[in-house]
Amino acid sequence: MSLETLKTLIPDYAKDIRLNIGSLANETILSEQQKYGCYLASAHAVGEAQTLRAIEAEARGKLSVEALNAAKAASAIMGMNNVYYRATHLVSNTTYTTMPARLRMNVIGNPGVEKVDFELWSLAVSAINGCGMCLDAHEAELRKHGVTSEQIQAAIRIGAVVNAAARVLAAEAALAAEPA
């Protein structure tokens, strides 16, 4: 599978999503590694089988083994951090925001790829998972490293489109499995 295959699976009612998959893949504002790492981290975050298989296959042709693993690691660690930090931010008792997380997250300090790339991937996943506190933290870190607003937006857009594609395909699969 590939992004082209993924696009063919998207029904006509979601044509905008199908077109966005292709247009984002053709954008040059992010490096190839940044772009396909965002796609892969986002696909792992949403976990829908067809989306994940298509994007994983595409990414294998574009990313080094180290970058593949780092994109997956970004999704994994954000799966934990986004829930934890979103919860501490949302709970009314502010005590939790002052407590140490006491969760292992060493991959953030040593992801095996450029820090900026890992931060972009973490940002895309944080957008999918809806953690405002994490989005603010990753955006601030990216800005410190000279990443532009347009590049940050591109990562978020990739996350949004991958999420939408996965939701469409999951809904279609659920309907297809319904007994007649």
Swiss-Prot record:
EC identifiers of the protein: 1.11.1.28
What is the superkingdom listed in this entry's lineage? Bacteria
Q: Which UniProt keywords apply?
A: Antioxidant, Disulfide bond, Oxidoreductase, Peroxidase, Redox-active center
InterPro entries per the UniProt record, alphabetical: AhpD, AhpD-like, AhpD_core, CMD-like
Give the annotated active site: 131, 134
Cite the Pfam families for this sequence: CMD
Name the Gene Ontology biological process terms.
Answer: cell redox homeostasis; response to oxidative stress
GO MF terms listed in the record are: alkyl hydroperoxide reductase activity; disulfide oxidoreductase activity; hydroperoxide reductase activity; peroxiredoxin activity
Got any disulfides in this one, which pairs?
A: 131-134
- List the Gene3D superfamilies: AhpD-like
Q: Which reaction is the catalytic activity of this chain? A: N(6)-[(R)-dihydrolipoyl]-L-lysyl-[lipoyl-carrier protein] + a hydroperoxide = N(6)-[(R)-lipoyl]-L-lysyl-[lipoyl-carrier protein] + an alcohol + H2O
Q: What does this protein do?
A: Antioxidant protein with alkyl hydroperoxidase activity. Required for the reduction of the AhpC active site cysteine residues and for the regeneration of the AhpC enzyme activity.
> Do you know which PANTHER family this protein is assigned to?
ALKYL HYDROPEROXIDE REDUCTASE AHPD
| Protein family | Belongs to the AhpD family.
Q: What is this protein called?
A: Alkyl hydroperoxide reductase AhpD
Native source species = Hyphomonas neptunium (strain ATCC 15444)
**Gene name for this UniProt entry:** ahpD
